[in-house]
Regions:
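A short, well-structured juxtamembrane/interface segment
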Residues: 28-47
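Short, basic/glycine-rich phosphate-binding loops at helix/coil junctions
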Residues: 14-23, 65-70
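Flexible, glycine/proline-enriched loop segments at strand-loop-helix junctions
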Residues: 27-28, 159
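Single conserved hydrophobic/aromatic residue that forms the stacking wall/gate
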Residues: 2-11
Length: 192
């Protein structure tokens, strides 16, 4: 569909896509009061090593955003890698209190799934950020942050919106910040 705007023909965003994104965001927000959010915040407050896997494509943007937000939130031991061999080495040599975070829109990307399984087999804490759909990544993870997203393709190209995954990441970082402030306030009150 095209519409004429002051003499220029532009493509109008179909109402159905906007409504779909709105519904996905509203549904995703209902998932954010899970106990997993609290448990992940509690774990991160102990400042363990956090390993992020950045497999390629659009997921890299989400992983880079999470990495930046964790650094801003004063997590000092954050390690991002794009190489599966390097992450395998980290899995085999890391402390058992280490956290491995995997982001996947489908929860079925083979290299991500295999690394998450390997991390669990080595007794590591695995956190997944993935779609609410039944997916293998969520099943092997210790904790999950989930989102709604409808898969869209055009001639085989993935056009699935990543908006809800960013919404989950942003909401979690905000929650984590409030959680840490609550701990600081609690510690300050105890010292009086």
């Amino acid at each position: 569909r095209y519409m004429q705007v002051t003499g220029v023909q532009t493509c109008a965003l179909p109402i159905s896509i906007k409504n779909s994104i709105k519904a996905d965001l509203e549904s995703t927000s209902s998932l954010l009061n899970s106990d997993d959010m609290f448990q992940i915040a509690r774990l991160l407050c102990s400042n363990p090593p956090v390993y992020l896997y950045s497999p390629a494509g659009l997921t890299d943007i989400s992983v880079s955003y999470l990495e930046s937000m964790l650094f801003i939130s004063d997590c000092q031991k954050v390690y991002k890698t794009t190489a599966s061999k390097a992450l395998r080495h980290f899995i085999q040599t890391a402390d058992k209190k280490s956290i491995f975070i995997f982001i996947s829109n489908s929860g079925r990307f083979e290299s991500t799934l295999n690394l998450a399984k390997e991390a669990r087999l080595h007794g590591m804490i695995v956190i997944s950020i993935s779609s609410i759909e039944n997916n293998d990544l969520a099943e092997v993870s210790t904790y999950n942050l989930r989102f709604f997203s409808k898969k869209r393709e055009n001639d085989g190209a993935d056009l699935t919106s990543r908006l809800c995954s960013f919404f989950v990441l942003s909401s979690f970082i905000e929650y984590f910040s409030f959680y840490k402030k609550g701990l600081e306030h609690e510690n300050f009150s105890e010292s009086d």
